[in-house]
């Protein structure tokens, strides 16, 4: 199973992934786009072509882990719709969550200090296209996810 969490940088993808993983039993792993870039694809920059390579690498990594029977939760910007479409064909079980957040609020919070840059930043000079064919859209108001919310999300995932 691969759960693919999409949203702006700073939208809460990693937080949601960590909350879900605490409730998932068995072999599980969190693949975070920031960690992959830091440790595995550090040679890639932030151009669209390098972002595409990074996204493809992450998708392939998730496929490998799925083939080893891991429950994979991936938090990623995922700005390429063709990768979202390919994921539905690539993975045995795939569930896509769009963590929809108000960009003005994210930019104001600027937790990762990336929105003060003006080059090659998604949401600033690179468009963030709304993800397609989402299995679940969560409107993040930046309040903690309750146990009931996490349970409801996992129930929706289990229903596929």
Tell what function each PLM region has:
Residues 8:
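P-loop (Walker A) phosphate-binding loop of NTP-binding proteins
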Residues 17-63:
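Conserved substrate/cofactor phosphate-moiety recognition/catalytic segment
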Residues 2:
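Walker A (P-loop) ATP-phosphate-binding motif of ABC ATPase nucleotide-binding domains
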Residues 11:
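ATP-binding Walker
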Residues 14:
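Walker A/P-loop
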Residues 5:
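Hydrophobic anchor at the beta1->P-loop junction of P-loop NTPases
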Residues 73-75, 87-109, 138:
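Conserved phosphate-donor/acceptor-positioning beta-strand/loop module used by diverse small-molecule
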Residues 100, 108-160:
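Small-molecule kinase domains that catalyze NTP-dependent phosphoryl transfer to phosphate-bearing small molecules
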